[in-house]
Design a protein with these regions (language model features):
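Catalytic adenosine-cofactor/nucleotide-binding cores of aminoacyl-tRNA synthetases and other
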Residues: 1-35, 122, 161-167
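C-terminal low-complexity, glycine/proline- and small-hydrophobic-enriched intrinsically disordered tails
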Residues: 123-197
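Acidic, turn-prone loop/beta-hairpin segments
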Residues: 25-54, 79-154
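Short alpha-helical functional segments enriched in proximate histidine and acidic residues
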Residues: 19, 56, 72, 80, ...
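Conserved short loop/turn motifs at secondary-structure junctions
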Residues: 1-2, 70-71, 87-91, 101, ...
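Conserved phosphate-binding loops in nucleotide/dinucleotide-binding enzymes
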Residues: 1-7, 52, 59, 63-64, ...
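Core structural elements
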Residues: 7-20, 39-48, 66-85
Length: 197
């Protein structure tokens, strides 16, 4: 558990560093405007996390709350959303998500989260005095779209690993994949994604 906690704190540091590198310090007032399916998906996931952790804390279910936070940060945010944002970064969603994560994590890792918060280029106050995050509702249709992309990418990765393929091509007949071609190529690690003729 100690090693897991240490790795989790390192992950938080790395995520914060990546987002700070992405965000333009001259424009720290990026508005929260989700534009991609991934943006809507992560905000929906964040809303569920916020509600779930708040409920767990009220019931003193600290282990359950920590597990929710751990899997969200490690899987949903770092593995999926951060990787997706490397294609089309949304500074507003990245900043808002990071701030919300730090607020939610603060009861479990107060010193680490406060230190990260103070290192943010746009931070002007103390994390301990900030309010619990309020997550805006997101588009459920976009959430489902990204879930579909995730499922296809996961299956593609598994097939690539099982068959020992090097930089395979993904042939499909999906309008969704066609409109998210660059994203799919990045996430699935394929040479190209092309529509089936």
């Amino acid at each position: 558990r100690i090693e897991e906690a240490r790795n989790f704190c390192n992950k938080l540091w790395n995520v914060a560093r990546f987002i700070q590198d992405q965000v333009d310090i001259k424009n720290t007032e990026d508005s929260l405007q989700p534009t991609t399916a991934a943006d809507h998906w992560i905000l929906s996931k964040l809303q569920r996390l916020t509600d779930g952790v708040a409920s767990d804390l009220n019931m003193y279910a600290f282990a359950e709350a920590y597990d929710k936070i751990y899997h969200f940060v490690w899987d949903d945010f770092a593995d999926w959303y951060i990787e997706s944002s490397k294609t089309t970064p949304n500074h507003g969603v990245l900043k808002f998500s990071l701030e919300s994560i730090l607020k939610i994590c603060h009861p479990f890792a107060p010193f680490v989260t406060e230190t990260i918060w103070q290192s943010l280029k746009w931070s002007t106050d103390l994390l301990i005095t900030s309010s619990w995050p309020v997550i805006p509702k997101s588009d459920t249709s976009h959430y489902k779209q990204f879930e579909e992309i995730k499922a296809i990418v996961t299956e593609s990765r598994q097939l690539t690993k099982t068959m020992g393929l090097q930089k395979p091509s993904l042939v499909h007949s999906s309008d969704l994949l066609e409109s998210n071609q660059e994203l799919v190529q990045r996430l699935a690690k394929v040479a190209q994604s092309q529509e089936q003729g």
